[in-house]
Structure formats: C-alpha cells, structure tokens
C-alpha cells in the first residue's frame, strides 16, 4: 500500500509529479482507497483481499504513516467501492445487501437487504444512502431504515446514482423489444418513482464496475456504451453527439472538464474529445493494454492508471 504526495512542477504550477510519502508491504491485494466527503487529511479506508485466507477485509488507515487502525471482515468486499456516510462506513454485504460499521471503531451498526443483486455504487444524496438492487433503487437513512424505493420494471440497474434537479439519474439494462436484444439505458426518475424520460445508450454487453454510469456536468450527461462516448442534453432528453473510440470504453464513464471529455479503453487507449461535438482532440496508446479505470483530472495533469503504473499526462496534448 502506497501513499504519494502530489508535487507542483516549478515551471508550471498547474502540472504535477509524484513522490512517495510512505510505502507498506501488505499480506493481501489492495483495492481502491476511499475517503469521506471532507477528504480527511488524517484517515482513509481501503478494502484488501487475502488469497491465503480467501477473504476480504475493510481497513481504516492513518494517512500520515499507513498504520492500520482497525480491520474487519468484508463479505463480498471485492465489488463496489464502499463509502463514508456521516460517522459510518458502508460496504456491500454478500451479493444483495449493504452493511454499515462505525467509522470510529469498525463495529457493525446495521445491514439492509435489497433482495436482488447489487451492481450500483453506494451514493450519499441529501443525508440518505442510495443503492440499486435488481430493478429497484433504495434510499436508506443513517439508522438503517429504508425511506424510499423507486422501481424500473424489468430492468437491471448498475453504475452510479446521481441527483439531478430533484430527480435521480441512473443507468441499467432493459430488453429492447424492437431490436430483440438487451440494451443499456439512461433514466431520469422523479421522487415519486415516475420515469421522466428514458434514453437508449445502445446495445452492449454489460461489464459494470465501480465507475460505471455517467458523468454529470450542468445539464449534460456523459456516458459510454460499447465503443462509443455519448453526450446527452438533459433539458430535452436528447442525444447531442456520439463518438466511436478504439477499444471497449463501456466499463466506466468518461471524465469531463470545462472544454473536453477524457476517456480510457480496454485496448489501452487514452483519449480526449471536444465537449461541444465529440471530435477527437488527441489519442494516446499504452502498451500496458487494459485500462480498467477512468482518468483523473488535477490542474492541467491527467492521471491514468494502466496495469501497475500511474501515468501523468499533459491533458492539453496527451504527452506523458
């Protein structure tokens, strides 16, 4: 497990490089670290998988030195990045439930059964925790009580759950009778459970991940499906543009700044498209092959995780 400091480039304050803060050998495979909304400078959390024990563990870590403050078993911790929900840490329990533990002590506080497979992220919206179970979205309060259920008949919901103008945006699959196949969709649902509109992303084998779903910017949603990057105008529920890229990009959403859209693919391509029309600005091919996570933007730097390495790219040009 590694913590690196982000250091400013002396010649350009908007570009950065990394150096080690600390590095600790772990007797397990380390998954994605995560933090609370306030991005505490003191504590972080991580899920690990021990092949020897064949078990997942949820750990609380001191960010100053990497010391493990507590560790608990996390059944099915391998899917779905956990989240911090006030003074609780919530993660998936088995395949169809979520469980909350005290962020202070790691003691179990409550669990909520969804009844069907959970393939969404865990999302905190207006002091409630939202997740999807099969074709249903559930909202849970800090006491572990289900306070709302929204249903999309015959669907399977996956990816992130995003608030938009009092409603909820989510993605999922549904059988398209006209095309006689399963297609991915983007839905906007109001708080009463009515589907305001449904937008087809396209025919695609679903390979969902912790970063599937959409990127929301103002009144525009950016999504990926198969080999396509797609932009939707949410004010009218209409697709604005669609761009084909090299490799499967539907596993995770693109990321967006004020002018451009950045994507990665399972063929090892990192690319940048114009936010207005989807035209490709630059492409970069990595010999590492599979890139299974979206890039991250920090200043003028684009962070890309490819295989076992983190690459820092100039986001304007794509140069490493």
Please give the residue ranges for each predicted region.
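Alpha-helical structural elements
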Residues: 17, 40, 65, 105, ...
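Repeat-blade elements of multi-bladed beta-propeller folds
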Residues: 2-7, 28-58, 72-99, 112-138, ...
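Non-transmembrane, interaction-prone segments in cytosolic or luminal domains
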Residues: 20, 62-68, 95, 116, ...
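Generic low-polarity alpha-helical segments
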Residues: 7-8, 18, 37, 46, ...
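Short loop/turn segments that connect beta-strands within beta-propeller blades
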Residues: 62-65, 102-105, 141-145, 190-194, ...
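A short helix->beta-strand "capping" segment at the edge of beta-propeller domains
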Residues: 5-32, 65-67
